[in-house]
């Protein structure tokens, strides 16, 4: 089936928000002489229903100092607030990753509809799209607020395809995380894997195409993804 629409992930695909998200938690862990390892963080990438970094911190502290663990557990709201401040400070100067703007402009010129399907909440995604002045490129923006379960479940991509009034097989998904790639495949969408700074350190599952950057591809080649032999 010919590709008729593009569905973009957000975090790590359009903007490298995953680096400050991880780094901000690592900074909080350092406050308690703890280490947050990438292999522990990995299940959280591309979803909102995996790893709880605060609960993990309490668990690690309990092995060393049960009393301190109790205090940290009780201070959850304060710790999350500090982490949010750090995350926003680290994210302040971020922009679109290479190739994103060009692909959006090409899709608009061709009349190809685009959507965003993200496991983050709506205020986060819409805030970024507005700040980066790209919201108008998207016919639909689907977030964790729109589904009962996020990636790796297929719900976000199925809903995005429905909002675009297209079958999933006609919607090409652009994803950076293993959870997102699994979700796209479960939805029946063709998927291009574009690992980011953080997800590039993880094993990436099979996809229809693997890229190091969206700057390495153009819209014409994406549209013919399922028919051009050089994509195999």
Regions found by a protein language model. Name each.
Residues 2-101, 105-110:
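N-terminal helical cap/lid subdomain that shapes the substrate entry/recognition surface
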Residues 90-95, 119, 187-188:
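Short, flexible loop segments at the rims of nucleotide/cofactor-binding pockets, characterized by
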Residues 14, 96, 114-117, 149, ...:
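Conserved SAM-binding loop
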Residues 35, 113, 190:
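Residue-level detector of anion-binding/catalytic polar loops
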Residues 12-13, 89-91, 112, 116, ...:
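Short, contiguous strand/loop micro-motifs
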Residues 1-3, 105-108, 121-232:
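Asp-based, Mg2+/Mn2+-dependent phosphohydrolase catalytic module
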């Amino acid at each position: 089936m010919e590709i008729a629409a593009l569905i973009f992930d957000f975090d790590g695909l359009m903007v490298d928000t995953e680096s400050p998200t991880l780094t901000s938690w690592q900074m909080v862990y350092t406050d308690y002489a703890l280490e947050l390892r990438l292999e522990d963080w990995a299940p959280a990438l591309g979803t909102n229903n995996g790893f709880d970094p605060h609960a993990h911190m309490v668990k690690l502290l309990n092995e060393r100092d049960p009393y301190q663990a109790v205090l940290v557990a009780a201070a959850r709201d304060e710790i999350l607030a500090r982490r949010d401040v750090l995350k926003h400070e680290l994210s302040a100067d971020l922009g679109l990753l290479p190739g994103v703007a060009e692909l959006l402009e090409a899709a608009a010129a061709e009349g190809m509809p685009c959507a965003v399907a993200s496991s983050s909440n709506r205020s986060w995604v819409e805030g970024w799209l507005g700040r980066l002045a790209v919201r108008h490129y998207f016919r639909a923006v689907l977030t964790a607020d729109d589904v009962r379960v996020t990636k790796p479940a297929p719900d976000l991509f199925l809903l995005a395809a429905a909002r675009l009034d297209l079958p999933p097989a006609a919607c090409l998904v652009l994803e950076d995380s293993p959870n997102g790639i699994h979700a796209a495949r479960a939805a029946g969408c063709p998927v291009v894997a574009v690992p980011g700074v953080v997800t590039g350190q993880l094993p990436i599952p099979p996809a229809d195409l693997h890229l190091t950057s969206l700057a390495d591809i153009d819209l014409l080649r994406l549209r013919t993804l399922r028919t051009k032999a050089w994509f195999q």
